[in-house]
Amino acid sequence: MFRPNSLLIPSNLSTTKSQRNTMLNSSYLSFALIFFCCILFSALASSLPVSDPELVVEEVHRKINESISRRKLGFFSCGSGNPIDDCWRCDKDWEKNRKRLADCGIGFGKNAIGGRDGEIYVVTDPGNDDPVNPRPGTLRYAVIQDEPLWIIFKRDMTIQLKEELIMNSFKTLDGRGASVHISGGPCITIQYVTNIIIHGLHIHDCKQGGNTYVRDSPEHYGYRTVSDGDGVSIFGGSHVWVDHCSLSNCNDGLIDAIRGSTAITISNNYLTHHNKVMLLGHSDTYEQDKNMQVTIAFNHFGEGLVQRMPRCRHGYFHVVNNDYTHWEMYAIGGSANPTINSQGNRFLAPDDSSSKEVTKHEDAPEDEWRNWNWRSEGDLLLNGAFFTYSGAGPAKSSSYSKASSLAARPSSHVGEITIASGALSCKRGSHC
């Protein structure tokens, strides 16, 4: 497995996971004010349809600015300016209110409710993975059920799956309160299903599977060809939210979304030690991906990454307030005329003089890609990093947003709002 060397970065931009966890123990606000904020965020989200990409961009901007404003006024002493986290993390009774998380989404995947309307299912058995006849108590048994389920884990566990974990619709995987690792085998597949939330998991060292039978519902199992070995594979899925996961070192992609997938938010994740990080769009000729809409927000792209953060095709992609501290080839790339709206990110280029460019326009001559709409607005470009604009470029344009005044949070604050990226260490009875 290819493991690129980590690059050195200034100490004020790089933190260890233990340092980041220590920095999280700040002051906290009362439950009542946070609950009020969550209601407000939910009302704002419900007023804007996912079908309008520009309005969703506007909504992300507005939520970030509202969170900042309240903090400046003293309302959010525990707030980070991260509207997702500020919606639920200040509640020390988070374990009793787990499903509140479903009302905290932003961006294109904001309507993903997962298993909010179902029962809580507790995974008690990390082993005994039978891909065709899973036992009650196992993760596979939970995810294939037809009814909505909010799936939690009884204790710390490492789950090594024998084949892909093929999820059914309306499921939440909630790792809070335990250290849950899915690793060493095939990992998560979201295929032709909807309303999935994946939160708080360590997903790493995922392998290929296939050439065997796998169950995907209580009534059906089918023959699977060889899988790619992604950490999270979204194949024709919709209303998907991947939040606060730690992902690394998988066979193909860490998170890939293809074949008409849409309405996706990828947020607050910590991604490390991988080559082809994130593919969004199946192929240059698969035009159904023109409807793809993905929000990539508040993630930390960390040590040992090479490329595809993300690599986009056809659709509309909002890359906002992420921290890019490492890449070897490039950070954001694409082909087949995707619209890429990069706002308020922090890009720290590697020392290699040949890899300073953030972007890579792929598989097209310049006279073609110069018409693709890619812009950088408010990004912080460090150590010689540069972003190659194209199409409408950095100018205010309806090609990107209808409300350019509601900008993303300043890139100088990215370190603060991404400091808790990855799977959190949540203890029952304490603020998460």
From Swiss-Prot:
Keyword Transit peptide among record annotations: no
GO biological process, alphabetically ordered: pectin catabolic process
InterPro entries: AmbAllergen, Pec_lyase, Pectin_lyas_fold, Pectin_lyase_fold/virulence, PEL
Cystine pairings recorded for this chain: none
Active site, UniProt feature: 308
Single GO cellular component term: plastid
Origin: domain of life: Eukaryota
Cofactor remark from the record: Binds 1 Ca(2+) ion. Required for its activity.
Signal sequence extent: 1-45
Residues bearing attached sugar chains per UniProt: 65
Gene Ontology MF annotations: metal ion binding; pectate lyase activity
Keywords recorded for this protein, A-Z: Calcium, Glycoprotein, Lyase, Metal-binding, Signal
Pfam families documented for this protein: Pectate_lyase_4
SMART domains, per the entry: Amb_all (SM00656)
Pathway terms, separated by semicolons: Glycan metabolism; pectin degradation; 2-dehydro-3-deoxy-D-gluconate from pectin: step 2/5
Annotated Gene3D superfamilies: Single-stranded right-handed beta-helix, Pectin lyase-like
Family listed: Belongs to the polysaccharide lyase 1 family.
PANTHER family listed in its UniProt record: PECTATE LYASE 18-RELATED (PTHR31683), PECTATE LYASE 22-RELATED (PTHR31683:SF104)
Full protein name: Probable pectate lyase 22
Protein source organism: Arabidopsis thaliana
